[in-house]
Amino acid sequence: MNSGVLLSESETDTSEVSGRQSELISGDESIKGKLEEFSAKLNELRLADGNSDGGDEEESLSPDTKSQREESSENSENVSRSTSRPPLTSSIVSSVEREQLKSQVKVKIRLQPIGAIPQIQPRVCQISAHQQFLALTRFLCKRLKRKHIHCYINNAFAPSLDQNIGDLWTQFKVNDELIVSYCETVAFG
């Protein structure tokens, strides 16, 4: 009974969690690898532009000096690829890492029925903070086998379906849980 979006507190399958963590780590490594390749290509393009400007200078150098210069540029390329990145690439890497951390953050949601609608077990679930409220309503419709569900935050208001659950949680949490009441018909207003 574990959906791709919601996890209950009682369902703690460590192999599933470790599998997800390994997927995230491998995805992180592949993104970093692609960014490093992109950075290396940019460095090569910059070096090619620098070599075309100083073409007359290289013609006057002896073959020994040219080979020493090529070796030193190769060594500096290897060092720059492994230790430092251009500022643009560094900012891209940091933004990708922030997005991955944001997607890993899960918030607790307490589900409370209103009226004659059945209660969902377990009552407390977790969902990714970056998900829209629509994902939660779809989960409830699927779990309760209903076409329409009306949801309310803290029995006070019905959020829009495109609102971010993480934002709702930070603004309206009670004891680190977002209380979502649900019913089959309009309950308030």
From Swiss-Prot:
Question: Annotated Gene Ontology MF terms?
Answer: Atg8-family ligase activity
According to the record, the segments passing through the membrane are none
Q: Which residues does the annotated region (Disordered) include?
A: 1-30, 45-92
Origin, by domain of life?
A: Eukaryota
Question: GO cellular component terms?
Answer: Atg12-Atg5-Atg16 complex; autophagosome membrane; phagophore assembly site membrane
Q: What does this protein do?
A: Ubiquitin-like protein involved in cytoplasm to vacuole transport (Cvt), autophagy vesicles formation, mitophagy, and nucleophagy. Conjugation with ATG5 through a ubiquitin-like conjugating system involving also ATG7 as an E1-like activating enzyme and ATG10 as an E2-like conjugating enzyme, is essential for its function. The ATG12-ATG5 conjugate functions as an E3-like enzyme which is required for lipidation of ATG8 and ATG8 association to the vesicle membranes.
Q: Give the UniProt family note.
A: Belongs to the ATG12 family.
Report the protein name in the record: Ubiquitin-like protein ATG12
Organism per entry: Kluyveromyces lactis (strain ATCC 8585 / CBS 2359 / DSM 70799 / NBRC 1267 / NRRL Y-1140 / WM37)
Source lineage: Eukaryota, Fungi, Dikarya, Ascomycota, Saccharomycotina
